[in-house]
């Protein structure tokens, strides 16, 4: 399964870890993905891998669940 946001397509990017002596070694910057249940526009519920920036910006609507009446 790809480490990619299913909403915006954000994917891992390569970069460098830079030490104090300015030596560079390669590393990966990965998106902060969360598995959430999402309510789709047609009303169905689907589990998706979504980055936190999409959750915070409101691009997806989280499924809250059934509320039981007491």
UniProtKB/Swiss-Prot annotation:
The keyword Ribosomal protein applies. Pfam families: Ribosomal_L28 (PF00830). Disulfide bonds: none annotated. Keywords: Ribonucleoprotein, Ribosomal protein. GO terms for molecular function: structural constituent of ribosome. NCBIfam families: L28. Residues 1-26 are annotated as: Disordered. HAMAP family: Ribosomal_bL28 (MF_00373). InterPro entries: Bacterial_rp_bL28, Ribosomal_bL28, Ribosomal_bL28/bL31-like_sf, Ribosomal_bL28_bact-type, Ribosomal_bL28_sf. This is Large ribosomal subunit protein bL28. Gene3D superfamilies: Ribosomal protein L28/L24.
């Amino acid at each position: 399964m790809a480490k990619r946001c299913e909403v915006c397509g954000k994917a891992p990017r390569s970069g460098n870890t830079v030490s104090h002596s300015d030596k560079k070694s390669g590393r990966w910057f990965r998106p902060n993905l969360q598995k959430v249940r999402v309510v789709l526009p047609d009303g169905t519920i689907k589990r998706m891998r979504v980055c936190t920036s999409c959750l915070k910006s409101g691009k997806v609507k989280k499924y809250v669940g059934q509320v039981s009446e007491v």
